[in-house]
């Protein structure tokens, strides 16, 4: 492990390092009140159960709503009980984008804002990009100050909105954070941290003054370390990120700016998602190229490396990875959620990494986020499952409490995945009990969400890697998963072995 230090004095943002706030014109976001607009938002979108999830004790239950096209990330506000969702459709010029506010419990529409057009947008040849907006991608809520921070990836910058009205507070200058991706808020220190997917920097902003401070540097350059997702433990001031360009993670002390690199297994390719567990010091990493979830200790010791789906193929029938993209830690229920873009699934893991349930997430699941109270939110970027709308799903998942087992499904029905005890010694998804966050109170196995259909999983051959943030229109995806579950029939002296079949 190597240590790269940035002095505390540097973090204090001297005149030589700080980026001055300039009076450059800041376009005002349009808060939309018209009955319809170009955002494509369905204000009355129906809320339905996620296919295959069941409201049974010990299982993951989910609801979803096709809110708008081009969904990218979510962020939860505890004080408002609102969910903020970003939307950006297509490739440059991105003319359709919005910041959407939903009720966090019901997913009902509350409000949305449409970013203004960027009048200076140009393509690689210097030609004007007419209609290009300050499209929003990454998102985080500062509840202390009542603001929402977003990344404008196409313009390499960030913006700040009012959390209640969604009016623009500040649009930062363009080209200050190369390919700005994730943003997290450190309310205790009045800081916002923004990852730069095309550099080896973490941009730092003062949230009390809305000014940019000195960057945090990780690695030698973008080829050595390109920061993707961010995971912050505010209590200890620990910021964790992962590199898409190398098999590394990094643990950053935000007080000093020092970054300690953590080596990952050599097979890890195009890592993008990261979640940090401060209680154990473990880091959870989702990697698109290798299609796996890797669990490592702070020193790089590998706890587990789990392929999240097999049998995934592109439209030409070629084998591809699951496209494990983002990861979230549910610290309330001791579970880890991973979005698998190519497989069209969300896999639920225990804290050791073993798969406990596979959920049909729709096509191209993109982001997953924990709200701190036992719920996990996700979005996809592939429209509806049946193709009836281009609007993507916002989904909310939670573990159903209770100890009563659900009825074993008919073996001829759609495949389901069972839970096992996250505290168990074996990293085997065929174990027979689940602990809902307490090792002393296991609950009997129940049957959770059905895996999406298809013995072979089709994804479009021209799918765009998420790091490019271009979106795509991929063919319907799914996964082929076999799970054996030893059921509660053991109590009757017999063992019921259920073989989950491949099905469409």
Role assignments for model-derived ranges:
Residues 103-107, 162-166, 206-210, 253-257, ...:
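Short loop/turn segments that connect beta-strands within beta-propeller blades
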């Amino acid at each position: 492990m190597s240590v790269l230090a940035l002095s505390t004095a540097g973090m204090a943002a001297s005149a030589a390092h700080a980026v001055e706030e300039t009076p450059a014109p800041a376009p005002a976001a349009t808060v939309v009140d018209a009955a319809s607009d170009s955002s494509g938002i369905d204000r009355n979108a129906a809320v339905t159960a996620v296919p295959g999830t069941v409201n049974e004790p010990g299982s993951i239950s989910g609801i979803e709503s096709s809110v708008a096209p081009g969904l990218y990330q979510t962020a939860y506000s505890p004080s408002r009980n609102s969910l903020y969702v970003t939307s950006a459709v297509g490739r440059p010029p991105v003319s359709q984008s919005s910041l959407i506010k939903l009720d966090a419990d019901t997913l009902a529409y509350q409000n949305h804002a449409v970013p203004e057009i960027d009048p200076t947008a140009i393509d690689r040849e210097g030609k004007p990009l007419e209609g290009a907006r300050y499209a929003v991608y990454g998102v985080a809520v500062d509840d202390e100050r009542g603001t929402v921070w977003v990344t404008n990836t196409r313009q390499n910058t960030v913006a700040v909105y009012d959390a209640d009205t969604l009016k623009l507070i500040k649009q930062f200058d363009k080209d200050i954070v190369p390919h700005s991706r994730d943003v997290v808020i450190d309310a205790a220190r009045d800081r916002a941290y923004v990852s730069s997917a095309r550099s080896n920097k973490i941009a730092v902003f003062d949230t009390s003054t809305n000014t940019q401070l000195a960057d945090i540097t990780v690695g030698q350059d973008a080829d050595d370390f390109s920061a993707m997702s961010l995971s912050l433990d505010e209590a200890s001031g620990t910021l964790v990120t992962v590199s898409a360009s190398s098999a590394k993670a990094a643990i950053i002390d935000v007080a000093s700016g020092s970054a300690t690199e953590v080596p990952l297994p050599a097979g890890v390719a195009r890592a993008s998602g990261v979640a940090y567990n401060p209680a154990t010091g473990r880091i959870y990493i989702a990697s698109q190229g290798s299609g796996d979830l890797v669990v490592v200790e702070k020193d790089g010791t590998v706890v587990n490396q789990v392929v999240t789906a097999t049998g995934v193929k592109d439209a030409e029938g070629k084998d591809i990875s699951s496209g494990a993209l983002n990861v979230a830690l549910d610290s309330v229920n001791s579970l880890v959620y991973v979005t698998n873009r190519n497989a069209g699934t969300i896999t639920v893991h225990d804290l050791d990494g073993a798969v406990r349930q596979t959920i049909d997430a729709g096509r191209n699941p993109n982001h997953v986020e924990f709200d701190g109270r036992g719920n996990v939110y996700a979005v996809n970027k592939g429209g509806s499952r049946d193709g009836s709308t281009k609007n993507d799903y916002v989904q909310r998942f939670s573990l159903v409490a209770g100890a009563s087992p659900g009825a074993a499904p008919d073996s001829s029905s759609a495949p389901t995945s069972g839970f096992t005890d996250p505290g168990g010694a074996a990293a085997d998804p065929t174990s027979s009990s689940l602990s809902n966050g307490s090792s002393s109170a296991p609950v009997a196995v129940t049957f959770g969400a059905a895996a999406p259909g298809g013995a072979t999983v089709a994804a479009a051959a021209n799918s765009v890697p998420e790091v490019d943030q271009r979106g795509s229109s991929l063919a319907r995806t799914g996964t082929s998963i076999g799970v054996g579950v030893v059921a509660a029939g053991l109590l009757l002296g017999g063992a019921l072995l259920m073989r989950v079949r491949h099905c469409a």
